[in-house]
Amino acid sequence: MAAGEPGDLGVYSFRFLPQKTFQSLSTPQTTSRLRQWSMLGRIEAQAFGFDQTFQAYRKDDFVTAFFKDPNVIPNLKLLSESSGEWLTLGTEVKKIEAINVPCTQLSMSFFNRLYDEAIVRDNGYIVKCLDSFCDPFLISDELRKVLLVEDSEKYEVFSQPEREEFLFCLFKHLCLGGALCQYEDVINPYLETTKLIYKDLVSVRKNPQTKKIQITSSIFKVTAYDSVGVCYPSTKSHEQTFSYFIVDPIKRHVHVLYHCYGMGEVS
C-alpha cells in the first residue's frame, strides 16, 4: 500500500526528542577515545518519535516522510563539508536510499574469533604487521587488515553476512576512525565503546513465549539526494561518513547515528 492511504498505513509524521540523550557518546572515557580516534565533534546521535505503526517493508516511505517532515528539517544535524560547522538539512530531499542493515547479535562473543585467529593476543594487544595502505587508511596491524584487505589471509574470519551486521559495522567504524585517527594498541577500547553505543541505540525485549531476549530494532543505512546530488549524510562520499536509522517499532522512536569523516576535535 502506498503512503497516504488511510489507517495505520498513512503518512508518517515525526517529532524531535531533544530530551533523549545518548550517554554512550558523552561519558568522559568515550569522549577521550573519540578524540583519539579523530571522531569527536563529528559524530552525533539524535532521537525522533513517530506516530504510525512501523512496517519494515515500507522503509522507503518511512525515510522519505522523515526527510520531508517539518519537525525533522530544522532539527536533523549534519556537518558542512566546507566550514566543518554543524548545520541542519536546509534542502529539499528528492530521493532517498535506505539499505537494510541486519541486527541479530546479542553478545560481544561475536568478536572472540579475533583472539582465536591470532589477530589479537591473549593479553589484548593487537598483532602488528608491515605497513601498507588501503586508501585512505594506513594498515599497520592485523585488525585493520582483517577489516579492510579482502585478499588478506584472515579476511574470511568474518563471512560477508557477518560483516553486514550492525554490530560489525559499528566496530569497524570505531576502529577506522577519522582523518587523524591514533590507533589503539589493544582491542578493549574498541570493544567496550562498540558495546556501549550498540546497547544505547538498539532496543531489545524478552519474548513472552520463549523468554529469550530478542532485538526489536530495524536498522537502515540512509542516503538522501536533492536536485544536485547526494546531500545527506554529506555531499562527499566516504566509507567513514554514514547515517544509520535505528527504528524501535514498539516505542515508535528512531535513533539517528551520524558521522562525517574528517579531522575531529583535538582539545
UniProtKB/Swiss-Prot annotation:
Keywords assigned: Cell projection, Cytoplasm, Cytoskeleton
Family affiliation: Belongs to the CFAP300 family.
Source species: Bos taurus
GO CC annotation terms, alphabetical: cytoplasm; cytoskeleton; motile cilium
Oligomer status and interactors: Interacts with DNAAF2.
Keyword Cytoplasm: yes
Residue ranges of coiled coil: none
Subcellular location: Cytoplasm; Cytoplasm, Cytoskeleton, Cilium axoneme
The keyword Cytoplasm belongs to this UniProt entry's keyword annotation: yes
Function: Cilium- and flagellum-specific protein that plays a role in axonemal structure organization and motility. May play a role in outer and inner dynein arm assembly.
Protein name in the entry: Cilia- and flagella-associated protein 300
